[in-house]
């Protein structure tokens, strides 16, 4: 059983965590600022540069761990940031950037255009690699998943858009008689 909610979060130097009256927590750091609404059933306590969360009952255990993980991800985002890398594998598959619009040519009869959300940076170092970075783990991961969903990797030839560290399990083709 996980006990993530009980772990104490250490706030690094240069990062400020503030809570307003409506349970909105704002984290400011060298890379930017993130604000998120937190559930009032879990209480946040600050002691110097340490933050911990307490719950009133065991039925709130899942929310307890979720809130602790969300705040920790916000702190990591404003200090280090998050990055996802995708590879395009297939003949003629390529990506290019036009302003903030990512244009994908992945075997359809038309190019697929995707607008990057606010706070997410997209880089295309080569026409088969895409790097998505930002301070919000949720936005970076969501946009990377949306790009991957345009043409997910298929198991027979391995063609498609995949994360760089993703392993695609290959299948054997049909054997003829």
Swiss-Prot record:
Keywords: Ribonucleoprotein, Ribosomal protein, RNA-binding, rRNA-binding
Source species, domain of life: Bacteria
TM spans (from-to): none
Any GO CC annotation of this UniProt entry: cytosolic large ribosomal subunit
Gene Ontology molecular function: rRNA binding; structural constituent of ribosome
GO terms classed as biological process: cytoplasmic translation
Record's keyword annotation contains Ribonucleoprotein: yes
Key word rRNA-binding present: yes
Subunit structure: Part of the 50S ribosomal subunit.
Protein role: This protein binds to the 23S rRNA, and is important in its secondary structure. It is located near the subunit interface in the base of the L7/L12 stalk, and near the tRNA binding site of the peptidyltransferase center.
Protein family (similarity comment): Belongs to the universal ribosomal protein uL6 family.
HAMAP family xref list: Ribosomal_uL6_B (MF_01365_B)
Protein name: Large ribosomal subunit protein uL6
Gene: rplF
């Amino acid at each position: 059983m996980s006990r993530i909610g009980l772990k104490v979060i250490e706030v690094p130097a240069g990062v400020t965590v503030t809570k307003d009256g409506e349970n909105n927590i704002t984290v400011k750091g060298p890379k930017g600022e993130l604000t998120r609404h937190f559930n009032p059933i879990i209480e946040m306590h600050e002691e110097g540069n340490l933050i911990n969360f307490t719950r009133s009952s065991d039925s709130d255990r899942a929310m307890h761990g979720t809130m602790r993980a969300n705040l920790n991800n916000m702190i990591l985002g404003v200090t280090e940031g998050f990055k996802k890398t995708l590879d395009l594998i297939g003949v003629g598959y390529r990506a290019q950037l036009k302003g903030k619009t990512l244009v994908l040519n992945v075997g359809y009869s038309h190019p697929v255009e995707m607008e990057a959300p606010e706070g997410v940076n997209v880089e295309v170092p080569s026409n088969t690699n895409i790097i998505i970075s930002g301070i919000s783990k949720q936005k970076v991961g969501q946009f990377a998943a949306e790009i991957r969903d345009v043409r997910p990797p298929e198991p027979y030839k391995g063609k498609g858009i995949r994360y760089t560290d993703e392993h695609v399990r290959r299948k054997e083709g049909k054997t003829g008689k």
